[in-house]
Amino acid sequence: MSKRLLGAIRSFGDPGTYVQVLRLLHYYGYSHVQERRKLTLGTGSTIAPNISFANAERITIGADTKVGERAFLWAGASTGRITIGDHCRLGPEVFVTASDYGLMPDETIAHQTRNERDVVIGDDVWLGTRVFVGAGVEIGAGCVVSAGSVVTRSLAPGSIAAGSPARVVRRREDYAVLAERPDEPEAVPSVSAAHES
């Protein structure tokens, strides 16, 4: 018998093989699996298997975008959309929501009115680990938001923001060069080359 055949026979006898099958069956039962089928996912984009989606039919993720482990993408129940551009990176445990609640003085917390507003994240945006993005926020193309930041107001393109609430701490000087790059990979200038010229 060949080594390959013996390896396959050993794999079928290994309890770990069946544990993986059970994990897949368990994963299939999660509600976010059905939600994942509803979202619009661009070419070459990847999302971690343990993301929480709400109302995914109102979520659009562009091409070549990566969404990290345990992220939350919660669109509004009726109108609030989440749109994420191309070439974005969302770190682990990022939370993006297109709805929040009011604080009406004569209503209990359980009966507050839900406010839904679209969230737009432009192309080439990097959101660090545990960034929160609230309803109605627009993050311009080329922005970088540091880990743990709370974004409650829109950010202009090329901004680097940090804090709670997030504030612009500087701008990407290289962003004008990167934004004008052609689609062909071989013609894309390096960041260091852009600084030398």
PLM regions: where:
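Terminal amphipathic alpha-helical/low-complexity segments used for targeting or macromolecular assembly
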Residues: 1-37, 43-44, 87, 100-104, ...
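Flexible, glycine/small-residue-enriched loop-and-beta-strand segment within the central core
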Residues: 29, 51-137, 164, 171-173
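Generic structural signal for beta-strand residues in well-ordered domains
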Residues: 34, 38, 44, 52-54, ...
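Residues that flank catalytic or metal-binding motifs in active/ligand-binding sites
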Residues: 92, 147, 157
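Beta-rich strand-turn-strand
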Residues: 129-144, 149-153
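Acidic, glycine-centered active-site loop in nucleotide-sugar glycosyltransferases
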Residues: 157, 162-165
